[in-house]
């Protein structure tokens, strides 16, 4: 289902509450996306307007300038996941701590170290988050990516 992206884009959006440090400035344009289709539509909106894009998920380990961030800030949110046997496919916006709880509830091990860790799976994967001698790279089997330049 196509979304009306122009109605969802916010102008002059305060980013302060979106980081764990609770400091920062504002975005020229902002949108919250909750799934892959919304993400692609937001990327394409910025691409058509020739605007830079900044991706933000859980907001941990990031400092945002007090100055205006030019372009579109895309906040990746939502908690989509599916389970097939002992494999769980998870959307990048899913809270890492919540994912640890979900996997434990399913009887899957390996993410116990992530309970209480702030941030999202997308950010954790990008930065190889870890604690207590374990890290996310030991649990991720595959990452699906979108090539902005190719549009695929």
Locate the predicted segments by residue.
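FAD-binding subdomain of flavoenzyme oxidoreductases
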Residues: 112-114, 123-152
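Anion-binding (especially nucleotide phosphate/pyrophosphate-binding) glycine-rich loop
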Residues: 1-121, 125
């Amino acid at each position: 289902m196509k979304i009306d992206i122009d109605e969802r884009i916010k102008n002059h959006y305060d980013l302060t509450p979106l980081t764990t440090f609770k400091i920062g400035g504002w975005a020229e344009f902002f949108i919250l996306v909750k799934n892959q289709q919304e993400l692609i539509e937001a990327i394409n909106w910025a691409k058509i307007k020739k605007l830079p894009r900044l991706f933000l998920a859980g907001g941990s380990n990031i400092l945002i300038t007090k100055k205006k961030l030019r372009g579109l800030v895309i906040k990746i949110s939502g908690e989509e996941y599916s389970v097939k046997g002992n494999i769980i496919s998870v959307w990048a916006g899913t809270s890492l701590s919540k994912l640890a709880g979900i996997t434990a509830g399913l009887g899957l091990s390996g993410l116990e170290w992530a309970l209480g860790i702030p941030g999202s799976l997308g950010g954790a994967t990008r930065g190889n988050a870890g604690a207590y001698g374990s890290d996310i790279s030991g649990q991720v089997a595959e990452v699906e990516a979108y090539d902005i330049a190719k549009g695929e």
